[in-house]
Amino acid sequence: MRLVIGISGASGVVLGYHMLKVLRFFPECETHLVISEGAKLTFGLETDLKIEDVEKLADFVYSNTNLAASISSGSFKTDGMIVIPCSMKTLSGIATGYAENLLIRAADVCLKENRKVVLVPREMPFGKLHIRNMKEASDLGCVIIPPLLTFYNNPQTIEEQINHIIGKILMQFGLEHEKFKAWEGTKDD
């Protein structure tokens, strides 16, 4: 399996970091990483992580300005892409096909090649334009998975919440995250 991981400048870049950490447990999964400049700034604001440490988790790393990278072409086969978190600017670019950088171009390529694209939009509250762009992206074939809190899995920590979100995303690619607690119904089922 070959996945493109895009980390854009929305709040919640730690979600992208955790996604890369979890994907390391799937040796069959080759990861291709693009980090936007906004995301690099957000890592500095929200975490103590160094960009180099995030990049080390990926098999391949690309500059967001390199529109000639392998992942910018449909002939480079992938199983899809995850944009985590997905800023509203990136969402807008994907929804309208305005591929001004590699992250958006890679998503555009996945869509034109009928490959799965999962967007994890991080904004609150969503404005009408955000919702319209999510609908447009969904109509194009994107799966929209906002990183919402869940409670049926009885989480006790932020890490458990993050693992649940990661698990929901990985399900889209047929991967099972061992720390994901699926709903098993009530005891009366």
From Swiss-Prot:
Q: Where does FMN bind?
A: G9, A10, S11, S36, S87, M88, K89, T90, R122
Decide whether keyword Transferase is in the record.
yes
Tell me, in a sentence or two, what this protein's role is. Answer: Involved in the non-oxidative decarboxylation and detoxification of phenolic derivatives under anaerobic conditions. Flavin prenyltransferase that catalyzes the synthesis of the prenylated FMN cofactor (prenyl-FMN) for phenolic acid decarboxylase.
Q: What is the lineage of its organism?
A: Bacteria, Bacillati, Bacillota, Tissierellia, Sedimentibacter
Q: Which UniProt keywords apply?
A: Aromatic hydrocarbons catabolism, Detoxification, Flavoprotein, FMN, Prenyltransferase, Transferase
Which parts form a coiled-coil structure per UniProt? none
Enzyme Commission code = 2.5.1.129
Q: What's a BP term from Gene Ontology annotated to this protein?
A: catabolic process
Give the catalysed reaction(s), semicolon-separated.
dimethylallyl phosphate + FMNH2 = prenylated FMNH2 + phosphate
Q: What else is known?
A: It is not known, if phenolic acid decarboxylase forms a complex composed of ShdB, ShdC and ShdD. The term subunit is often used in reference to the operon, however there is no experimental evidence to prove the existence of the complex.
The protein in question is named Probable UbiX-like flavin prenyltransferase
The family assignment reads: Belongs to the UbiX/PAD1 family. YclB subfamily.
Q: Which residues cross the membrane?
A: none
User: Do you know what upregulates this one?
Assistant: By 4-hydroxybenzoate and 3,4-dihydroxybenzoate.
Give this protein's Gene Ontology molecular function annotations. carboxy-lyase activity; flavin prenyltransferase activity
Q: Which organism is it from?
A: Sedimentibacter hydroxybenzoicus
Q: Which Pfam families match?
A: Flavoprotein
Look at the named UniProt entry and state the broad enzyme category this protein falls under: transferase
Q: Which InterPro entries match?
A: Flavin_trans-like (IPR036551), Flavoprotein (IPR003382), UbiX-like (IPR004507), UbiX_pad_YclB (IPR032901)
Task: Say if the entry is tagged with keyword Transit peptide.
Answer: no
On assembly, the entry states: Homododecamer.
